[in-house]
Swiss-Prot record:
Organism lineage: Bacteria, Pseudomonadati, Pseudomonadota, Alphaproteobacteria, Rickettsiales
Transmembrane annotation, as ranges: none
Family: Belongs to the KAE1 / TsaD family.
Organism: Rickettsia conorii (strain ATCC VR-613 / Malish 7)
Necessary cofactors: Fe(2+)
Localization (cell): Cytoplasm
Its EC number(s): 2.3.1.234
Residues at which Fe cation binds: H112, H116, D308
Annotated Pfam families: TsaD
Protein name (database record): tRNA N6-adenosine threonylcarbamoyltransferase
InterPro entries: ATPase_NBD, Gcp-like_dom, KAE1/TsaD, Peptidase_M22_CS, TsaD
Length: 344
């Protein structure tokens, strides 16, 4: 049986997973660093890298035990090798390459964004091509996923990522870290029409997005309010989340038009939303309705595979393993690595 070991360390989650050739997840361990970074209100790269160094060995032992797998049973080792916080990326990549060398097993360098992009093929086995909205704390872009290693970026944020906007607004409201889930929780209790926020470049006619102005508008509002109580916090969270939904819905329409100009597979109308923001139930509902209007089906991974995880890295490794796309051990990890720059 083919077993793929996946390692993820691009930000603040240390993750190790083992999957089979049949897309079965035997084990998927994630060691969160939220407690270590919460006091700073955000991820500290140096702390993250050191934590990966101390957690990876433990995570590997746990995943082997949970999956009843021996290291010698592993067929290949896939590890995030960019983009991301370079300290953590180097730690995970070096760990994987050391295992590869010691076990004499192939190594596969995985682009972290490709891991997110292919998650829906792991969970739903959808065919190529499909339209992807990659929405996380570090990235926000629409991508035409045409095949393995074949990606066309249709548009992206020109400033902040949508996940970063969630986290920063949560910090303004003194909510816990990470902020995205806290905003969603508070938004359920608030009035989404209480405050009207701007929707930057919503009528630009292209797939690019902007969230910096929205973030600034929230900060300006908070500074003008005399009192910030729970009701106000709930209303701001709801109004902010509503505005994000309006922006993304509008841009999905632009992305569909751009996507249909470059693909003729009109019988396979799938839109995938991946990345941490894909876990937001409100956005799932809004974007699902928008997709349905245009005859598309919105697909999003289960919540534990929306955020950073190693199962998606292992699956990307499986697709590359099946195509014999291995990586030399002297591969240099990258802090920046566009999906369009991936080579097969």
């Amino acid at each position: 049986m083919i077993k793929i070991l996946g390692i993820e360390s691009s930000c603040d989650d240390t993750a190790v997973s083992i999957i089979t050739e049949n897309r079965e997840i035997l084990s998927n361990i994630i060691i969160s660093q939220n407690t270590e970074h919460a006091v700073f209100g955000g991820v500290v790269p140096e702390i993250a890298a050191r934590s990966h160094l101390s957690h990876l060995d433990k995570a590997l032992k746990n995943v082997l035990k949970e999956s009843n797998t021996k290291l010698t049973d592993i067929s290949t080792i896939a590890a995030t090798s960019g983009p991301g916080l370079i300290g953590g990326v180097i730690v995970g990549s070096m760990f994987a390459r050391s295992l590869s060398s010691a076990l004499k097993k192939p190594f596969i360098a995985i682009n972290h964004l490709e891991g997110h992009a292919l998650t829906a093929r792991l969970t739903d086995n959808i065919p190529y091509p499909y339209l992807l909205l990659l929405a996380s704390g570090g990235h926000c872009q629409f991508v035409a996923v045409l095949g393995l290693g074949k990606y066309k970026i249709l548009g992206s944020t020109i400033d902040d990522a949508v996940g970063e906007a969630f986290d920063k607004v949560a910090k303004m409201l003194n909510l816990a870290f990470p902020g995205g889930p806290e905003i969603e929780k508070r938004a359920k209790l608030g009035d989404p029409h209480k405050y009207k926020f701007p929707k930057p470049i919503i009528n630009s006619g292209n797939c690019n997005m902007s969230f910096s102005g929205l973030k600034t508008a929230v900060r300006t509002l908070i500074m003008t309010l005399k009192e910030i109580n729970d009701t106000v916090i709930n209303d701001i969270a709801a109004s902010f989340q509503f505005t994000i939904g309006e922006i993304l819905s509008s841009k999905v329409q632009d992305a569909i038009r751009a996507y249909e100009q470059i693909t003729n597979n009109f019988d396979k109308k799938n839109i995938v939303i991946a990345g941490g923001v894909a876990a937001n139930k409100y956005l799932q509902k809004i974007l699902s309705s928008c997709a349905k209007t245009y005859g598309y089906r919105l697909i999003y991974p289960p919540i534990h595979l929306c955020t950073d995880n190693a199962a998606m890295i292992a699956y990307a490794g499986l697709e590359r393993y099946n195509n014999k796309l291995f990586t030399p051990l002297n591969f240099c990890p990258k802090a920046r690595w566009s999906l369009e720059d991936i080579s097969n």
